[in-house]
């Protein structure tokens, strides 16, 4: 794995509300196919922490979701929150990454990071299925250096029966004529997330969530996640 810390136009602005620029880390690590990809991580360090919290975001967010968690943990606890590939400030790969690929990607990343020891997994939204898939594979590896000591899931799905339909909002968003307009051509899907928030999302926080998604090319994976 190679750190890529050189300045880039595609890094979180230093003045985002609640964001510490020192948390940003760029690394080159493989994806599911072994292709080197550029990942952006929220990483509080240190590498020898007594516990690591692996935090996995959902859609349409990025590691900014975990800013309060990163600020609250004691100094001997490390938070690692990757921007999933094609999301946040991580590389746009041009590959439609379905759930199985995202699980493989996360496994490849944690292997490259040489994650070991006491690990608590925290996940939100689509990060839940990705994190649970990662957990299942990690538990199945008899020689894994990782000891899972906790799991926190928020606003996610653990299991959906085959006959169950998606929530109304998601079903509507998936309509072929609406999906690209709401998720790629515009920021409507992102802004809809804010409108569902109670209390209302402050403008400074909205700016934080919107920061990586300023153009249609950077929003394509939002549609693919839906």
How would you label these PLM feature ranges?
Residues 1-26:
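An N-terminal hydrophobic leader/cap segment in hydrolases
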Residues 20-23, 27-37, 42, 81-123, ...:
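Active-site loop/oxyanion-hole signature of alpha/beta-hydrolase fold enzymes
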Residues 42-89:
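Conserved HGGG/HGGXW glycine-rich cap/lid loop of the alpha/beta-hydrolase fold
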Residues 65-67, 90-96, 162-165:
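Conserved catalytic-core motifs of eukaryotic protein kinase domains, centered on the activation segment
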Residues 83, 154-155, 212:
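Alpha/beta-hydrolase-fold catalytic nucleophile elbow
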Residues 117-165:
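Conserved hydrolase catalytic core segment
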Residues 157, 162-183:
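A catalytic-pocket lid/entrance helix-loop region that shapes and gates access to the active site
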Residues 161-164, 183-226:
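Conserved alpha/beta-hydrolase catalytic His-Asp/Glu region
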